[in-house]
Regions:
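Basic, short loop/linker segments at the boundary and entry of helix-turn-helix/winged-helix-like folds
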Residues: 1-43
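Polybasic low-complexity intrinsically disordered regions
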Residues: 24-35, 39-42, 48, 76, ...
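DNA-recognition alpha helix
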Residues: 47-62
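Major-groove recognition helix of helix-turn-helix-like DNA-binding domains
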Residues: 61-79
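Alpha-helical architecture
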Residues: 65, 102, 174, 241-242
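Helix-centered, glycine/charged polyanion-binding patches within enzymatic domains
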Residues: 182-252
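Basic, amphipathic alpha-helical segments enriched in Lys/Arg and hydrophobic/aromatic residues
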Residues: 232-294
């Protein structure tokens, strides 16, 4: 199964490499650096493991493998990040995003005794934890419509606003009660989206401060009188789609589970998460092809 996913990843890397420039002083192409990084992530191993030829299948191994120091330096360059983004677009397909999108965050917790200088304390899974957080907007594609990796202390509302600003299009954005803020409703509407989330304090009034008219609309959608209009509740029932997206992202071999000991510092976490998203996109594409041929 790993080799089937690798075939998808390798084809996408080759397609991007065909039009991707190369610095004249580079010994190894960016495509080779990306292949080594993805091979390590596919098998949940460190980069140094993937730098040894014995750990590759002969049919998958590049002609030459970089050493660990080269990988450490090259994976922090902008061209490496740009290459990964283009591979993500290739695996994500050309389907237009849906009118209904869902936003949420997934904590990436570290042990409490971690010495990672970038990790911060914040709200984890039902407790205060230290680590990072993966923020994402999904609409059913193989890749998220937008995502970001931050420290755990970063505000989910602020990150939602940043991702909405990059989305484009229009429609409904479903979220949980943690995103209930009038300024965020106005910001989403300015970018073409109606934020739909329950009140942080249900069953109470709206207070005497400024209340966004778009927040009032969401309240009317989710709290219809006597259940006469079920459009809002039926629409919001789709918010569980992101829970399935997050669960499917971790429920297979090679998925985004806990961060391994060698993934510390923010740039390594971002590269690791991106690799796992690409691997998951390859898995989704294979599953959809199998479903169509069945």
């Amino acid at each position: 199964m790993e080799l089937e996913r690798w075939a998808q990843l390798s084809a996408a890397v080759s397609a991007v490499a065909a039009d991707f420039g190369r610095h004249p002083r580079d010994t190894y192409s960016t495509a080779t650096i990306v292949r080594v990084h993805l091979w390590a992530a596919l098998f949940d191993r460190s980069t140094s493991w993937a730098c040894r030829a014995v750990n590759w299948k002969p049919c998958t191994r590049p002609a030459e493998l970089p050493d660990q120091s080269t990988m450490s330096r090259r994976t922090r360059r902008d061209d490496f990040e740009l290459f990964l983004e283009q591979v993500g677009k290739r695996l994500g397909g050309k389907a237009a995003p849906g009118l209904v999108r869902v936003v949420d965050g997934k904590p990436l917790e570290l042990p409490n005794h971690t010495t990672d200088r970038d990790a911060t304390w914040g709200r984890g899974v039902s407790r205060t934890s230290v680590g990072y957080k993966f923020h994402a907007v999904f609409s059913g594609g193989a890749m998220p419509d937008a995502f970001a990796v931050t420290t755990l202390a970063a505000s989910e509302k602020d990150m939602a606003a940043r991702m909405v600003g990059r989305l484009g299009g229009h429609g409904y954005l479903l979220a949980d009660a943690h995103f209930d803020a009038s300024w965020l409703f106005d910001y989403c509407r300015h970018h073409g989206f109606q934020l739909v989330c329950p009140r942080a304090k249900p069953g109470t009034g709206t207070g005497h401060h400024y209340v966004s008219p778009h927040r009032l609309r969401a309240i009317r959608m989710l709290e219809p009188p006597a259940g006469v209009n079920t459009f809002g509740p039926d629409l919001y029932a789709r918010r569980t789609d992101i829970e399935r997206q997050f669960s499917q992202l971790v429920c297979f071999g090679g998925g985004l589970t806990t961060l391994p000991p060698w993934v510390r510092r923010i740039w390594r976490v971002r590269n690791w998460v991106m690799a796992k998203l690409l691997i998951n996109a390859a898995r989704v594409r294979l599953n959809r092809k199998a479903a169509l041929s069945a």
